[in-house]
């Protein structure tokens, strides 16, 4: 029995047509379940390189099929993560707002048509199921919790005209108890508030990280105007009060402005309000049902500060949080739910790992990809990369670490990670500056050997395993100064424990660092810069390595260091436009009362995602059909050396922002000998 779960949008990567509500159609993914067991899963953003991709997850579907060695026609059930009625309503809304469009007002027909175009096969409509959004979330959590019975809470911005679900999971059944309407959305409570802190959608976790710097007391009364706790364990949210009240009460922060103490206090008040509401709901329903286990999913369940406080509260004996709690996890839940309905339920086992994504491939394949980067990198094959990587890190290096299959979900759990020494507090600022290009207050997570976790962190008696970075826990007071780079301002950390049985390669590099330093912990953050998703492939890893100030890179069995590339090395690279980029010439005001024709490259549907480029670069990019050798194009456009250097510098800046791609030519596979041992 093969069930394919899908989340995401209903348009192709180069189309900007289905501009649906921003609380829906994002975080596209595909998950393949065979007889109740997950065999392959990946988020579309990892493959199409669009953060929170709202496109049809074509590449994700293709990966799942190829991994299983099957065709789309072999799939018994395709499960989409929303009800058909909701999808049809969204299409009708779209038609009203964009009457020039020609799309069917039948979501199943639209999905079938897209799958037929992309995979060359007609899908029997009886094999397509539309699954309730919040039931998808619920199944993703409960079916992987290992619990025979638990309360289930799903909370997010919205989906299927609802913002949450409270249910009871028992055996192979999920029975809803209560649904929370979209008007009472906890996700929107957070989103509407952070707009006045200079943030927007998908930035909620940043404000969670800012909250410990503030005091909730100054704005507590203000926030109590925004919600009401009801006697039956319910609540109401008054979203329409948030904007007017905050405009009158605070100094609104714009993006890029410094944070004042008022902004930090507001973040703390918001976090406190969220916690009060969720505790109110769960305490009531735990008492009336007598159930002492909890399964959590939905985007708000990524609030690991809330999760940590719930775990330590004693309301529940145990809590399971779905690692892919956001909408990508709905693809998983939809597939598991339909597999259960078709007679193949998931085993009642606690989820241990989520390394379900694409594999790096064989050593030979990895080596060939690396060699193609020629004069840009030095490569060394090593039989003990863990020891060498630990040596680099102990000597102060910040490195990329890429191994095996990629993780499903938003966390880098040791296979697509940036690693550093967790001890110097300066490492936090350094990584924020050289790689992430983000706010300096943002914390980093520690990865600790599972057997040593209790020595450094205050863990509840009921739980010693925290493999998914879902919970914030206190760092032991005696260890806080030692772990300066991973201890947040309030003395906590977002913990990952690492088991030798689950991820031996990652365990070994942490253990090698322990042997050198006495500390069985590494700083772990996702391997990406501030504009891209987490890297997935070898090419992604090398690109991010070359466009950041990382000191070294480990990919599989290979140690990699940067070379100073010559102009000839750059000329041998291929230049191409990503499918999500487009070129435009527009009339725009460039100075007061002066309008000119300007050139832009856009990475989204509107001019808001536009970067202005020179007319010379515009001409260069317009000449590309697919991909072209950079040197050949420069020869045509810029015979002058100064012009070449200026264009190359402009291209490098766009490459760093992922507006263009620079990469080896596909036919360029001439091998060179590997370098002598690399020292950082």
Curated annotation (Swiss-Prot):
Question: What sections of the protein cross the membrane?
Answer: none
Biological process terms from the Gene Ontology for this record are: biosynthetic process
Task: Say where the protein is mainly found.
Answer: cytoplasm
One cellular-component annotation, GO:
cytoplasm
What is the species of this protein?
A: Sinorhizobium fredii (strain NBRC 101917 / NGR234)
Task: Identify the EC number(s).
Answer: 2.1.3.-
Protein name per its UniProtKB record: Nodulation protein NolNO
Which PANTHER family does the record cross-reference, listed alphabetically?
NODULATION PROTEIN U
One of this protein's Pfam families, by short name? Carbam_trans_C
User: Which InterPro entries does this chain map to?
Assistant: ATPase_NBD, Carbam_trans_C, Carbam_trans_C_sf, Carbtransf_dom, NodU/CmcH_Carbamoyltrnsfr
* CDD domains listed in its UniProt record: ASKHA_NBD_NovN-like_N
GO MF annotation terms: transferase activity
What keywords were assigned to this record? Cytoplasm, Nodulation, Plasmid, Transferase
Which lineage ranks, top first, belong to the organism behind this chain?
Bacteria, Pseudomonadati, Pseudomonadota, Alphaproteobacteria, Hyphomicrobiales
Localization, per the record, is: Cytoplasm
Family affiliation: Belongs to the NodU/CmcH family.
Primary role: Involved in the O-carbamoylation of nod factors.
Name the gene. nolO
């Amino acid at each position: 029995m093969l069930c394919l779960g899908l989340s995401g949008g209903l348009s192709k990567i180069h189309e900007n047509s289905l501009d649906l509500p921003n609380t829906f159609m994002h975080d596209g993914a595909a998950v393949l379940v065979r007889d109740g067991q997950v065999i392959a899963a990946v988020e579309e953003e990892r493959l199409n390189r669009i953060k929170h991709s709202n496109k049809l997850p074509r590449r994700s579907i293709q990966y799942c099929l190829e991994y299983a060695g099957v065709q789309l026609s072999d799939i018994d059930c395709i499960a989409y993560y929303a009800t058909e009625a909701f999808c049809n309503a969204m299409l009708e809304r779209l038609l009203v707002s964009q009457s020039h469009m020609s799309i069917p007002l039948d979501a199943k027909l639209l999905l079938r048509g897209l799958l037929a175009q992309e995979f060359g096969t007609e899908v029997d409509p009886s094999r397509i199921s539309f699954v309730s959004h919040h039931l998808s979330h619920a199944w993703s959590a409960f079916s992987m919790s290992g619990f025979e019975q638990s309360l289930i809470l799903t909370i997010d911005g919205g989906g299927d005209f609802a913002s949450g679900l409270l249910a009871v999971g028992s055996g192979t059944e999920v029975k809803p108890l209560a649904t929370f309407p979209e008007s009472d959305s906890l996700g929107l409570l957070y989103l509407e508030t952070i707009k006045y802190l200079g943030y927007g959608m998908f930035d909620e976790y940043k404000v969670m990280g800012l909250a410990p710097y503030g005091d909730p007391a100054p704005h507590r009364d203000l926030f109590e105007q925004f919600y009401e706790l009801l006697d039956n364990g319910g609540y109401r949210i008054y979203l329409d009060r948030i904007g007017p009240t905050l405009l009158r009460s605070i100094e609104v922060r714009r993006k890029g402005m410094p944070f004042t103490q008022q902004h930090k206090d507001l973040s703390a008040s918001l976090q406190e309000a969220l916690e009060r509401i969720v505790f109110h709901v769960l305490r009531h329903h735990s008492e009336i049902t007598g159930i002492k286990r909890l399964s959590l999913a939905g985007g708000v369940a990524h609030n690991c500060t809330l999760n940590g406080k719930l775990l330590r509260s004693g309301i529940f004996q145990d809590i399971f949080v779905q690692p892919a709690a956001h909408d990508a996890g709905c693809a998983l839940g939809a597939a598991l739910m339909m597999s259960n309905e078709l007679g193949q339920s998931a085993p009642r086992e606690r989820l241990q790992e989520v390394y379900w994504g694409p594999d790096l491939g064989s050593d030979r394949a990895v080596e060939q990809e690396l060699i193609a980067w020629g004069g840009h990198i030095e490569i060394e094959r090593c039989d003990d990369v863990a020891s060498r990587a630990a040596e680099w890190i102990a000597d102060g290096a910040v490195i990329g670490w890429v191994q095996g299959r990629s993780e499903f979900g938003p966390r880098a759990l040791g296979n697509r990670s940036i690693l550093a020494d967790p001890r110097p507090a300066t490492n936090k600022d350094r990584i924020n500056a050289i790689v992430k290009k983000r706010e300096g207050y943002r914390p980093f997570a520690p990865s600790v050997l599972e057997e040593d976790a209790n020595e450094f962190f205050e863990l509840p008696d009921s739980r010693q395993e925290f493999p998914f970075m879902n919970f914030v826990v206190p760092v032991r007071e005696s260890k806080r100064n030692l772990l300066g780079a991973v201890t947040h301002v309030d003395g906590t950390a977002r913990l990952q424990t690492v088991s030798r049985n689950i991820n031996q390669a990652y365990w070994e590099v942490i253990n090698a660092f322990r042997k050198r330093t006495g500390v069985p912990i590494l700083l772990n953050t996702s391997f990406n810069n501030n504009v891209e998703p987490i890297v997935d492939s070898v090419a992604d890893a090398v690109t991010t390595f070359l466009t950041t100030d990382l000191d070294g890179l480990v990919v599989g069995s290979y140690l990699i260091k940067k070379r100073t590339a010559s102009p000839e090395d750059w000329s041998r690279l291929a230049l191409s436009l990503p499918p999500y980029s487009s070129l435009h010439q527009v009339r725009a005001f460039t100075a007061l009362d002066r309008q000119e024709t300007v050139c832009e490259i856009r990475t989204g549907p509107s001019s808001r995602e536009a970067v202005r480029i020179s007319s010379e670069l515009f001409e260069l990019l317009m000449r590309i059909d697919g991909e072209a050798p950079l040197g050949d194009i420069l020869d045509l456009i810029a015979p002058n050396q100064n012009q070449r250097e200026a264009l190359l510098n402009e291209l490098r800046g766009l490459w760093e922002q992922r507006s263009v791609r620079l990469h080896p030519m596909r036919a360029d596979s001439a091998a060179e000998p590997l370098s002598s041992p690399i020292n950082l």
